Amino acid sequence: MADPADVKKLSFETAMEELESIVKRLEDGKVPLEESVAIYERGEALKRRCEELLRTAEARVDKITTDAAGQPTGTAPLDVE
């Protein structure tokens, strides 16, 4: 298992791919208990990394604001809730 510090270096896609692999291994139920705990902890770190990257991307997304005539006037933070 890789060093937890390297999770911070992973791209979203790489972290998500590894997380999906961990979930599959745990769901299969063929991993010994001690190893299950270790890969679960790795999965938690990967989940946090993915959430961090998604929050960062969300903060960068803007919506285009328009005037009454529909002409662009600028941008504003995108309200996704």
Curated annotation (Swiss-Prot):
The keyword Nuclease applies. Disulfide bonds: none annotated. InterPro entries: Exonuc_VII_S, Exonuc_VII_ssu_sf. GO terms for biological process: DNA catabolic process. One of its GO terms (cellular component) is exodeoxyribonuclease VII complex. Keywords: Cytoplasm, Exonuclease, Hydrolase, Nuclease. It is an enzyme of class 3 (hydrolase). It is found in: Cytoplasm. It catalyses: Exonucleolytic cleavage in either 5'- to 3'- or 3'- to 5'-direction to yield nucleoside 5'-phosphates. It holds the Pfam family Exonuc_VII_S. NCBIfam families: PRK00977.1-3 (NF002139), PRK00977.1-4 (NF002140), xseB (TIGR01280). Heterooligomer composed of large and small subunits. This is Exodeoxyribonuclease 7 small subunit. It comes from Rhodopseudomonas palustris (strain BisA53). The gene is xseB.
